[in-house]
């Protein structure tokens, strides 16, 4: 799904959000170049913390809140509850507006099974794997250029 929606996100980022400073949304080697002025030890420490916080802690807390707490409370909206919850989750990622189409599609596909089975653990695993894979790719991109 990411591969299908990546051209849309890239177009949004390079047109509508082109005013963002380099490194704010490091998704390519050109974006990551702004981070290369820092010492390798600082980058290792930063990306180590990033992987723990954004790859594990953040997704678990988000899933506990959005799918564990909020989704059951939105059930009064019936079949619209998963879509409403996904829209709220997408807007919650306000600092990444170029990724809204990707977040909306990826988590819409994830939230319906969670809503049906009332089991958030699959969502936690998927969300952690998604964030860890992106974080590891970003880490490799930046640290590969800092070698």
Question: Where are the predicted features?
Answer:
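Membrane-interface interhelical connector segments
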Residues: 12-43
């Amino acid at each position: 799904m990411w591969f299908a929606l990546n051209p849309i996100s890239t177009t949004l980022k390079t047109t509508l959000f082109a005013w963002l400073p380099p490194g704010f949304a490091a998704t390519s080697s050109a974006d990551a170049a702004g981070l290369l002025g820092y010492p390798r030890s600082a980058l290792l420490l930063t990306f180590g913390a990033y992987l723990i916080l954004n790859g594990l802690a953040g997704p678990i807390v988000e899933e506990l809140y959005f799918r564990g707490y909020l989704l059951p409370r939105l059930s009064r909206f019936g079949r619209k509850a998963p879509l409403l919850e996904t829209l709220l989750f997408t807007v919650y990622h306000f600092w990444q507006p170029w990724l809204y189409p990707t977040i909306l599609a990826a988590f819409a596909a994830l939230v319906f099974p969670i809503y049906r089975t009332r089991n958030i653990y699959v969502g936690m695993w998927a969300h952690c794997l998604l964030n860890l894979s992106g974080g590891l790719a970003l880490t490799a991109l930046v640290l590969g250029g800092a070698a």
